[in-house]
Amino acid sequence: MALKIVESCVNCWACVDVCPSEAISLAGPHFEISASKCTECDGDYAEKQCASICPVEGAILLADGTPANPPGSLTGIPPERLAEAMREIQAR
């Protein structure tokens, strides 16, 4: 079991203090989750604490590689609408 933090991480430190297994550390350009320490909060919390506090959509991946906070999950803006709005802005 292990989650993964990817390059879109903004190093806000929010996840470090909420990790019950102390599996998150700064290791290069962004934080890293230790695969040997990460329990995905099983037995401690119903939700993965790092993902629940992360302010960046897609910065934390589940073990299967899917985003813990997929596009639209934090903003409430459906990804289709966001893509449409971006096209409208770029067309100006």
Curated annotation (Swiss-Prot):
Keywords: 4Fe-4S, Electron transport, Iron, Iron-sulfur, Metal-binding, Nitrogen fixation, Repeat, Transport. Its cofactor is [4Fe-4S] cluster. [4Fe-4S] cluster 2 binds at C38, C41, C50, C54. One of its GO terms (molecular function) is 4 iron, 4 sulfur cluster binding. Residues 2-28, 29-65 form the 4Fe-4S ferredoxin-type domain. Binds 2 [4Fe-4S] clusters. InterPro entries: 4Fe4S_Fe-S-bd, 4Fe4S_Fe_S_CS. [4Fe-4S] cluster 1 binds at C9, C12, C15, C19. GO terms for biological process: nitrogen fixation. It comes from the Bacteria. PROSITE patterns: 4FE4S_FER_1, 4FE4S_FER_2. Ferredoxins are iron-sulfur proteins that transfer electrons in a wide variety of metabolic reactions. This is Ferredoxin-like protein in nif region. It comes from Azotobacter vinelandii.
